[in-house]
Amino acid sequence: MDFKKLANQYRDELLDNVLPFWLEHSQDLEFGGYFSCLDREGKVFDTDKFIWLQGREVWMFSMLYNKVEKRQEWLDCAVQGGEFLKKYGHDGNYNWYFSLDRSGRPLVEPYNIFSYTFATMAFGQLSLATGNQEYADIAKKTFEIILSKVSNPKGKWNKLHPGTRNLKNFALPMILCNLALEIEHLLDPGYLEQTMETCIHEVMDVFYRPELGGIIVENVDMDGNLVDCFEGRQVTPGH
């Protein structure tokens, strides 16, 4: 197998096909932000804007600008998405909504902590691309809010009855590990090391289960034990 040939194939497909598709079809040049619901021809079939996906696209084009090539079109795309998120994506106190309508009006309340994580990633990379301190401050403030929510990520929107089956979920330590590295330039080195050690412990010593053949389960009880229920048996291959 020719790995160099494969690497070139993937790079060419990304730079010559995938990215031009999203640059051309996903940007909402009237209201700002991005369309995420596109068919194979680039036609928009739904105009709602989800904070997860808005943040991911800001991050993607910022990261490409930072690490692949200083293309102005990539930076412009990232900045316009970042400005839309900054203006409409949160409640004024960096509690990030789950979704907005096309013009930026909130549709779903900020119940989902992963809206916060993708916003942090977005503004962390955008601050590197632009040198804009405001973007860095948004990333740091949102990260602080995430940490304050770790013990109860959904807060007042938690629909579970307290005390009956308390579980902790794999997704949060997984993404916190990734997130801390994404905003490494904004964190104290000692704090970064502590966060990484905690997350690695959670992933490798709590959710990784050698007795099940080395799989990672999505949920355990608060003491790290397996739970024989739907949630306890859940495995997410993408994680």
Task: Identify the residue ranges that each predicted region occupies.
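Glycan-recognition and catalytic cores of secretory/periplasmic carbohydrate-active enzymes
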Residues: 1-239
